Design a protein with these regions (language model features):
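Positively charged n-region of N-terminal signal peptides that target proteins for export
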Residues: 1-6
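Bacterial N-terminal signal peptides
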Residues: 7-15
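Sec/Tat signal peptide C-region and signal peptidase I cleavage site
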Residues: 16-22
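Extracellular/periplasmic metallocenter environments
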Residues: 25-43, 49-52, 73, 94-137
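Short beta-strand segments of immunoglobulin-like
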Residues: 53-58
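Short coil/turn motif common to extracellular beta-sandwich-like domains
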Residues: 59-65
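Acidic, Ser/Thr
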Residues: 68-72
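Short, surface-exposed beta-strand/strand-loop-strand elements in extracellular ectodomains
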Residues: 75-84, 134-136
Length: 137
């Protein structure tokens, strides 16, 4: 009987180790724009402080990123590709707010999102490199 109980519990002990027990967190990042070349971010992510010109943002799957945007003339999108215009928007996870906002809040809950590289992009100035990477681990 003890062996049966152990065998029943074994998959749970193995399968739920490591990051499966990690709590989801919410990270707030302020976004402004400088000229036609850069977003300036200030806030936190899984690695600690996020600040400066177009930095990479790193979170775990299931975390939420809240961008507080004050970037006149720079529509802010979260995308699957670093591209101009309104295409390639993320379609997984839970978005709150409006993609393309220049002033306001855009939140992305990454529950259900595949691990990998995503992008925050100015849809008007992507050819000039305005934007950066979001890494989901």
């Amino acid at each position: 009987m003890k062996i049966m109980r152990f065998l029943f519990l074994l998959p749970f002990l193995i399968g739920f180790s490591g990051s499966a027990f990690a709590d989801s967190e919410t990270f707030k990042i302020d976004v402004s724009a400088e000229g036609y070349r850069d977003y300036i971010l200030s806030g936190t992510d899984r690695n600690g402080s996020v600040s400066g010109i177009d930095p990479t943002v790193s979170v775990n799957k299931g975390d939420t990123i809240t961008f507080d945007i004050e970037a006149s003339r720079h529509p802010f999108y979260i995308k699957t590709e670093f591209s101009r215009g309104g295409g390639d928007q993320v379609t997984t996870g839970i978005l709150s707010g409006t993609q393309g906002t220049q002033k306001g809040t855009l939140s992305w809950n990454t529950k259900g999102v595949s691990r990998g590289k995503y992008y925050y992009v100015c849809s008007s100035h992507a050819p000039f490199g305005i934007g950066g990477s979001i890494i989901i681990e």
